[in-house]
Design a protein with these regions (language model features):
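N-terminal amphipathic alpha-helical interaction or autoinhibitory segments
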Residues: 17-42
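Short cysteine/histidine-rich zinc-coordinating motifs and their immediately flanking basic loops
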Residues: 15-16, 44-51
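Hydrophobic membrane-insertion alpha-helices, especially the h-region
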Residues: 75-92
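N-terminal, intrinsically disordered, polar/charged segments of Gram-positive cell-envelope systems
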Residues: 48-65, 94-193
Length: 374
């Protein structure tokens, strides 16, 4: 029957003889007394005969309002607690990702960007962003473009979410529905000379037929791996001195893990690793690396350290890329490339057919003329 202190008031309540002052006193007490609140619930749940003995209407004893007021207070208290916990989670997330000069936040952004550019030929991450959420979560968007001539064409958008350092792909959308680039390479150790010559002839014939006012994207495979310094005179020998010669935009990196199979020798997406002409880092130390070779080796180090993330971004089996072995090979043997994606005027690219160093070619996209310096 409620607590002993208010026993007499409860008896008056059941008889319907409470005064207005006694009613207010009992209401205030019920809000702070769990025992009396339980007793009130029991009284309200009783059958009709008990309800008939409730105080007359003119006494205005709305005890049901006390019950609901208490419930709303409880709900409000829970909501406040949830908001406080969420705010604390946000502060902890900000501290976790932005500590040490945003190191973890840069990793969340850097690794997927490098992975996309390393596994998708002629791709660059040129937009998007990362938002830090409560409880050590982030959401990121990566806007990809490809370079055809002097124009950057939208390629697609990748969206990711992460918890701590674990990353997942949440959405992929390509401009051309399903992205299937016609960019392939062949390793120099493959001996299928006749096939490579015939397949490449189709590319050269197409470039010969297209209008002069076009630019194109061509992937070429070399007769051996070359250093970046060795490529400069090789390309100069093809295009000679020009104000705006065709531009290399992506390189197929020789990592010692390329498939060498005379029956299955065409390397497509997932079979190779490469790097763009301009490797983008968020980390200040990596950005300050002086040479392209040093940047490539650092890129491979980062990718090998985060192999699970790279495989998720590239949507490849965990054992396919062997990034640890690739990184070690490049570090020990230096940066050499066995192919590249190059873009420029279609008729200029046609000159590559005369180079003794080009064994194989595939044709990517062709666009209307945009070959001018902005």
């Amino acid at each position: 029957m409620g607590c002993a202190e208010f026993k007499k008031l409860w008896e008056k309540y059941e008889k319907g003889t409470l005064t207005h002052d006694e009613q207010e006193r009992l209401e205030s007490h019920i809000e702070t007394c769990e025992e009396c609140e339980v007793h009130l619930d029991e009284l309200l749940a009783k059958s009709e005969p008990i309800k008939k003995r409730l105080p007359p209407k003119d006494l205005k004893v709305p005890f049901w309002r006390i019950k609901w007021k208490h419930r709303l207070q409880t709900v409000g208290f829970i909501l406040v607690i949830c908001i406080v916990i969420y705010m604390i989670g946000g502060v902890l997330s900000a501290f976790y990702f932005q500590a040490d000069n945003d190191k973890r936040l840069k990793e969340i952004r850097d690794v997927p960007s490098l992975a996309l550019e390393a596994t998708i030929p002629n791709s660059r991450v040129m937009g998007g962003g990362t938002s830090v959420e409560a409880f050590f979560r982030t959401n990121s968007q990566f806007d990809l473009v490809k370079t055809i001539g002097k124009k950057e064409m939208p390629l697609g958008t990748i969206e990711t979410s992460s918890f701590l350092s674990s990353l997942n792909i949440t959405h992929k959308s390509w401009v051309n529905m399903r992205y299937q680039p016609n960019i392939h390479f062949v390793h120099p150790k493959i001996k299928q000379g006749d096939y490579l010559k015939d397949a490449s002839k189709k590319v050269w014939d197409t470039l010969a037929k297209v209008h002069e006012g076009t630019v194109a994207e061509v992937a070429i495979s070399f007769d051996k791996p070359y250093t970046l310094q060795e490529l400069e005179p090789l390309l100069y020998g093809v295009f000679e001195a020009q104000e705006l010669p065709p531009t290399p935009v992506w390189y197929a990196l020789d990592t010692g893990q390329e498939r060498i199979n005379e029956e299955d020798f065409i390397l497509s997406g997932g079979d190779f690793i490469g790097f763009p002409e301009h490797i983008g880092f968020l980390d200040d130390e990596a950005k300050n690396l002086k040479t392209q070779e040093a940047k490539v080796i650092e890129m491979m180090r980062i990718l090998s350290t985060h192999e699970k993330t790279v495989n998720k971004v590239a949507m490849l089996p965990e054992d396919q890329l062997n990034l640890d072995k690739r990184y070690k090979y490049v570090k020990d043997n230096g940066v050499k490339v066995y192919g590249m994606v190059i873009t420029g005027p279609s008729k200029e690219l046609l000159k590559l057919q005369n180079s003794p160093h080009v064994r194989y070619a595939t044709l990517g996209d062709i666009e209307v003329w945009n070959w001018f310096d902005h």
